[in-house]
Amino acid sequence: MINTRKSHPLMKIVNNAFIDLPAPSNISSWWNFGSLLGICLILQILTGLFLAMHYTADTATAFSSVTHICRDVNYGWIIRYMHANGASMFFICLFMHVGRGLYYGSYTFLETWNVGVILLFATMATAFMGYVLPWGQMSFWGATVITNLLSAIPYIGTNLVEWIWGGFSVDKATLTRFFAFHFILPFIIAALAMVHLLFLHETGSNNPTGISSDADKIPFHPYYTIKDILGALLLILALMLLVLFTPDLLGDPDNYTPANPLNTPPHIKPEWYFLFAYAILRSIPNKLGGVLALVLSILILVLMPLLHTSKQRSMMFRPLSQCLFWLLVADLLTXTWIGGQPVEHPYIIIGQLASITYFLLILVLMPVASTIENKLLKW
């Protein structure tokens, strides 16, 4: 008799995706982040659901409702801080996951990669709208600054911004719609993640060598289930260390001041995971130019398969490309630091240099290095 997990219509899907899935025998811990992102998403949806039970999306009561969650709701403080710091863990995993894809040439799975880029945009949009909900000073001014960027779009810009606001400034209508979108988007992300997985399972996983692993596959369970559980335990450990010891480490003190349209904070800045993009935005003195650079800094990922000039898929055996990759990582860390600094000398010039280096590395230096490495193969 055939096994139930192989015959049952629903169990069959789960079995083929997580149990009997043939996986490469040599995938390293860099392949753990996909499952960790799934865990982060589930955690965010669950904590978010419980927060939504007590939150009110109204300018008069939003800030108070968050205070009420932290003070009066049973274990409300831990739910709130798990949600806030869970977003940080989510983005750490996202950056690692994308970095892994760049290093090992996983972007050659076109559909999987492009759905992944859409997932990245959707997650960034969700995080931005979530940051607005507590209705603190940084929530309000962050929303004002970022939505205002759309006014740089020629001809329709101003109308578009007012349409998004639902009025002539960030107000009650804006907060209500942001809450609605912040609630629905994670479910869209979950659906997209399933599409992401569907496309991945059409080709099978990449591996550190970048060579086909069809000749050497092992079942996902128990080998990678146990490996994913270890990863999950480490993720939860890191998250709970943050939540229980330094819950406000990654937040902005300004967000503990209720939103006041009449008082602008001295330094408006987003959460840490957007600082690199914010630095690129600020480094261009022109509004439209800055917005374009901001969008392109993420959208450039779509071009990665086109910019791949190497005869090898992975960077494992390409020392020149490896150096440039880690230079790119250092560059992004520099820009993350700059994005959190005030707009003054020497930070302005450092930010501009970091932004130029970022685009130069991806568009010019890395493809050229790959071509040189191809030539070196003939020696």
From Swiss-Prot:
GO biological process: mitochondrial electron transport, ubiquinol to cytochrome c
Endoplasmic reticulum as UniProt keyword: no
Cell compartments where the protein resides: Mitochondrion inner membrane
GO annotations of cellular component type: mitochondrial inner membrane; respiratory chain complex III
Primary localisation category: mitochondrion
Cofactor requirement: heme b
Annotated cofactor note: Binds 2 heme b groups non-covalently.
GO molecular function, one term: metal ion binding
Residues the record lists as binding a ubiquinone: 201
Sequence intervals crossing the membrane: 33-53, 77-98, 113-133, 178-198, 226-246, 288-308, 320-340, 347-367
Keywords for this protein: Electron transport, Heme, Iron, Membrane, Metal-binding, Mitochondrion, Mitochondrion inner membrane, Respiratory chain, Transmembrane, Transmembrane helix, Transport, Ubiquinone
Binding-site positions, heme b b566: 97, 196
Membrane topology, as annotated: Multi-pass membrane protein
Amino-acid positions noted as binding heme b b562 in the UniProt annotation, renumbered to this chain: 83, 182
Described purpose of this protein according to its UniProt entry: Component of the ubiquinol-cytochrome c reductase complex (complex III or cytochrome b-c1 complex) that is part of the mitochondrial respiratory chain. The b-c1 complex mediates electron transfer from ubiquinol to cytochrome c. Contributes to the generation of a proton gradient across the mitochondrial membrane that is then used for ATP synthesis.
Subunit structure: The cytochrome bc1 complex contains 11 subunits: 3 respiratory subunits (MT-CYB, CYC1 and UQCRFS1), 2 core proteins (UQCRC1 and UQCRC2) and 6 low-molecular weight proteins (UQCRH/QCR6, UQCRB/QCR7, UQCRQ/QCR8, UQCR10/QCR9, UQCR11/QCR10 and a cleavage product of UQCRFS1). This cytochrome bc1 complex then forms a dimer.
Protein name: Cytochrome b
Organism: Nanger granti (Grant's gazelle)
